[in-house]
Amino acid sequence: MVRFESTDSLMLARQLPNKTVALILAGGRGSRLKDLTATRAKPAVHFGGKFRIIDFALSNCLNSGVRRIGVITQYQSHTLVQHIQRGWSFLNEEMNEFVDLLPAQQRLSTEQWYKGTADAVCQNLDIIRRYDAEYIVILAGDHIYKMDYSRMLLDHVEKGAECTVACIPVPISEGSEFGIMEVTADYQITAFYEKPANPPPIPGDPSNALASMGIYIFNADYLFKLLEEDNNTPGSSHDFGKDIIPQLTARKVVWAHPFDLSCVTSNAELPPYWRDVGTLDAYWRANLDLASVTPELDMYDRAWPIRTHMEPLPPAKFVQDRSGSHGMTMNSLVSGGCIVSGSVVVHSVLFPRVRVNSFCTIDSSLLLPDVHVGRSCRLRRCIIDRACHIPEGMVIGENADEDSARFYRSEGGGGVSDSGYAGKVRGKIEPLGFLFVRLDLLIRLSLLIRLNLFIRMNLLIILTLFFKLASIQASH
C-alpha cells in the first residue's frame, strides 16, 4: 500500500493532481510485438482478457486524482482512438476533466512526424500550454503496473525538483534494454545512460541496475523551456531518455523516485509489479501472470480498479458436448462471450467471444478476441491473434520444427498467429516460449485440406463413372 509520512503530506498529495496534466505517449509501433502491432498501436493491444494495455496508465491517472489527460497518438491509431472514445468518454468536461486525443499533425514541420518522445510533446505545446497546469506527468502508454502518481508528485514537490524520474531495480543482464541512472543516497540523479551496453550496477547490489520506468514529472514552465531548447539543438534526437534527462543531470535539478514508494498493492507482502511488455515473450508471460493462483498484480482490488470499455456480452459458458465430455478450465481467465464445449483449458487466457469446440486441449496460451478453435485441436504455449479460425485437428506447440515452418516462433521458443491476410512467417527457435499463429497461414492450411478433400471426392466420382461406363460397354 502507498503510505504518506504525515497528515500534511497526505493533504498536499490530494491537492497536487488538480494542478497536473498527464500526457500519455501512445504513438509507438512496438515492432518487437511482430504482427500483434501490424494493424494497431502497441498501447491498443489486448491484455489480460478484457483490457487494452493503455487502460493501466489511464486508470492510474484517474485513481490518482489526475483527471486531465492528453493521449499523444501517431502509428495505426484508429483502434486506440476508437477504444478511448468508447470506454473513456465519461469524464465531466464541465469540471475540466477530459481525455484529449492529440494525433500527429506536423505542426512544426510539413516533412516530419514525431521524431522522438520529446518531439511528440513539443509538437503539441500550443495545446498543452492551454491546459494551464503547474505540473506535467509524462507516461508511457505500454506498461503494465498500478501506481499512485499523487505520491510521486508529492516527492517531486518536497524535493524542489524541476524533473523527477520514476525508477525500479532490474537485473543487470536486462539493463541494456532501459535507461539506467546513477543516484546519490537521497536519489538525486548524477548520471543517466540510455540503453547502455554495460549498465552500471546499484552500489552494494551488483546484480541489479537502477532503470527508468519512462515516467517523468516536470514543472510545466521548465518543461516548455527545455523542449524549445531541444527543438533548436542541432543533432538532437529529441528524446527524453537520450537527450533531455542526461542534460539535466549536470544541472542538478533531476531526482529519482523509487517505484516501491508509490506502487499500489492490496497486500504489503507482494513485490512491486511493473512489466514492459515490449516483446512477445514478455507479453505472453505478463498475461499468464494474471492467471496465477496468487498473481503479483491484483486485478481484484476494488480500491484501485482498472477501467476499460465494456462490451455487452453474455457470461462465459462451459458445456457438455454430445459425447458427454465436459468443458472445463483450471487456473485460467475466461472472458465474456466465450463458449468452451467438451474441452480442457489450463493456465490460459481466453479473450471475449472465443469458441473452443469439443475434444481440445488449450495449455498456457492466449486466445485473443473472436478466435474459433475447431474440434480435436491441441494448442500449447501459443498466442492466437484476433479472429483466427484454427482448423479441426490442428496441433500447435508440440513439434518445434513443424511449428517453425508454419508460424512465427518467439525468442523464447513459442509461437503466434495474426489476423492479417498477407505476410510472411518469420522466426527463430530458442528453448522456451510460444507460437504466434497467423490467420493467413491458417487459411492456406485450411484451403489445402479442403482442396485435398475436393480432389479426392472428384476422383471418386470420376472412377465411379469410369467403372459404370466400362460395365455398360462390357454388357454390350
Swiss-Prot record:
UniProt keyword annotation of Ligase present: no
Family matches, as InterPro entries: ADP-Glc_PPase (IPR011831), ADP_Glu_pyroP_CS (IPR005836), GlgC_bac (IPR023049), GlmU/GlgC-like_hexapep (IPR056818), NTP_transferase_dom (IPR005835), Nucleotide-diphossugar_trans (IPR029044), Trimer_LpxA-like_sf (IPR011004)
CDD domains from the UniProt entry: ADP_Glucose_PP (cd02508), LbH_G1P_AT_C (cd04651)
Catalytic reactions of this protein: alpha-D-glucose 1-phosphate + ATP + H(+) = ADP-alpha-D-glucose + diphosphate
Entry's Gene Ontology BP terms: glycogen biosynthetic process
UniProt KW keywords: ATP-binding, Carbohydrate metabolism, Glycogen biosynthesis, Glycogen metabolism, Nucleotide-binding, Nucleotidyltransferase, Transferase
Gene Ontology terms for molecular function: ATP binding; glucose-1-phosphate adenylyltransferase activity
Enzyme Commission code(s) on record: 2.7.7.27
Residues bound to alpha-D-glucose 1-phosphate: 114, 179, 194-195, 212
Function description: Involved in the biosynthesis of ADP-glucose, a building block required for the elongation reactions to produce glycogen. Catalyzes the reaction between ATP and alpha-D-glucose 1-phosphate (G1P) to produce pyrophosphate and ADP-Glc.
Subunit annotation: Homotetramer.
Protein name, UniProt field: Glucose-1-phosphate adenylyltransferase
Organism the protein comes from: Yersinia pestis
Lineage of origin: Bacteria, Pseudomonadati, Pseudomonadota, Gammaproteobacteria, Enterobacterales
